Amino acid sequence: MSSGHFFQGHWCDVFKCTMRCLSCTHTLSLVLCVLALTPATLEAGPETLCGAELVDTLQFVCGDRGFYFSKPTGYGPSSRRSHNRGIVDECCFQSCELRRLEMYCAPVKPGKTPRSLRAQRHTDSPRTPKKPISGHSHSSCKEVHQKNSSRGNTGGRNYRM
């Protein structure tokens, strides 16, 4: 055996040993990290909803019905909670489920669907188009300014009292 072949074989053995040791070190580090993080993950549990996040979630869950921050009296089972607890107490300070969020939605009015409510909003007060006064349809800018000044209008804004 030549000395070159001996050194080449020796370096291969050293390289293999080093790779095994690095591999073991990385594996051990990974296992320790997983073990260290596991108890925190188990204790965390579901997330809570507070502030704008709670409002956005309620709007999504309740839709057009709307929602209450405190439950109306006689709405849902009240034996488990005190009278002054609301959605913030139940879903911000502790986690809550979808069923709990739905309890704070306003009840659906019988016979009205969200679509009919939307349509009704647009048809409740029909607006009549303004009719131009005969003979004054082509007023000059100066005439319009004089009319507005005589009415006490400032800055082109219309104020109603």
From Swiss-Prot:
Keywords for the protein's UniProt record, in alphabetical order: Disulfide bond, Growth factor, Secreted, Signal
Subcellular location: Secreted
Cited SUPFAM superfamilies: Insulin-like
Single GO biological process annotation from the record: insulin-like growth factor receptor signaling pathway
Coarse class of the protein's main subcellular location: secreted
GO CC annotation terms, alphabetical: extracellular space
Disulfide bonds: 50-92, 62-105, 91-96
Xref: InterPro entries: IGF-I, Insulin-like, Insulin-like_growth_factor, Insulin-like_sf, Insulin_CS, Insulin_family
Residue ranges, annotated region (A): 86-106
Region annotation B: where it falls in the sequence: 45-73
Gene3D superfamilies per UniProt: Insulin-like (1.10.100.10)
Region annotation (C) ranges: 74-85
Region (Disordered), start-end ranges: 111-161
GO molecular function, one term: growth factor activity
Prosequence residues removed at maturation: 115-161
D: annotated span: 107-114
Function (record text): The insulin-like growth factors, isolated from plasma, are structurally and functionally related to insulin but have a much higher growth-promoting activity. Acts as a ligand for IGF1R. Binds to the alpha subunit of IGF1R, leading to the activation of the intrinsic tyrosine kinase activity which autophosphorylates tyrosine residues in the beta subunit thus initiatiating a cascade of down-stream signaling events leading to activation of the PI3K-AKT/PKB and the Ras-MAPK pathways. Binds to integrins.
Sequence similarity: Belongs to the insulin family.
UniProt name for this protein: Insulin-like growth factor 1, adult form
Protein's organism: Cyprinus carpio (Common carp)
Upper classification of the organism: Eukaryota, Metazoa, Chordata, Craniata, Vertebrata
